[in-house]
From Swiss-Prot:
Superkingdom of the organism of origin: Bacteria
The protein's name in its UniProt record: Small ribosomal subunit protein uS13
A Pfam entry, by short name: Ribosomal_S13
Gene name per UniProt: rpsM
InterPro entries in alphabetical order: Rbsml_uS13_C, Ribosomal_uS13, Ribosomal_uS13-like_H2TH, Ribosomal_uS13_bac-type, Ribosomal_uS13_CS
Job of this protein: Located at the top of the head of the 30S subunit, it contacts several helices of the 16S rRNA. In the 70S ribosome it contacts the 23S rRNA (bridge B1a) and protein L5 of the 50S subunit (bridge B1b), connecting the 2 subunits; these bridges are implicated in subunit movement. Contacts the tRNAs in the A and P-sites.
Keywords on record: Ribonucleoprotein, Ribosomal protein, RNA-binding, rRNA-binding, tRNA-binding
Assembly, per entry: Part of the 30S ribosomal subunit. Forms a loose heterodimer with protein S19. Forms two bridges to the 50S subunit in the 70S ribosome.
Recorded family membership: Belongs to the universal ribosomal protein uS13 family.
One Gene Ontology term of the molecular function aspect: structural constituent of ribosome
GO cellular component: cytosol; small ribosomal subunit
Length: 127
C-alpha cells in the first residue's frame, strides 16, 4: 500500500480515485495533482514508481492543507466563531443549522432525534 499524507491508499485503485482517500483532496484536486505532475489518470496506484509517489507527497505537502492540519484548522475556526459570540458562533454552540435553514419542521440531522415532550399524559376520552 502506498502511504501518502499519513493515509494508506489501496493498491488496485486508479491514481485520481486513490488520492481522494486523503481528507481534503476531492475529485478536482486529485485531477489537478495528476495533470500538474503528468501522471496518467488511468494508471493504478500499484503501477506508480517510488519516484512518482515521492513527487505526489512533495506536491501535496507544498500546496495543500490535508488530514490533521485541515481538521485542526476547521475546529479552530468554529472555536473562534464561538468565542466571538457572533450569530454563527451561537448557532454552532446551540447545535443548530448555521446557514439560515429553517428549523421549525426540519433540521433533524443537526438537532438529533426527535424527543417526546415529557410530563404530558393523555387524558381518556369522556363518553
Amino acid at each position: 500500500m502506498a502511504r501518502i499524507a499519513g493515509v494508506n491508499i489501496p493498491q488496485n485503485k486508479l491514481v485520481h480515485i486513490g488520492l481522494t482517500y486523503i481528507y481534503g483532496i476531492g475529485n478536482k484536486f486529485s485531477s489537478q495533482i495528476c495533470t500538474s505532475l503528468e501522471i496518467p489518470k488511468a494508471k493504478r496506484i500499484n503501477e506508480l514508481t517510488d519516484e512518482d509517489i515521492l513527487k505526489i507527497r512533495e506536491y501535496i505537502d507544498a500546496n495543500f492543507k490535508v488530514e490533521g492540519d485541515l481538521r485542526r484548522d476547521y475546529s479552530l475556526t468554529i472555536k473562534r466563531l464561538i468565542d466571538l459570540a457572533c450569530y454563527r458562533g451561537s448557532r454552532h454552540r446551540k447545535k443548530l443549522p448555521v446557514r439560515g435553514q429553517r428549523t421549525r419542521c426540519n433540521a433533524r440531522t443537526r438537532k438529533g432525534k426527535a424527543i417526546a415532550i415529557a410530563g404530558k399524559k393523555l387524558t381518556p376520552l369522556k363518553k
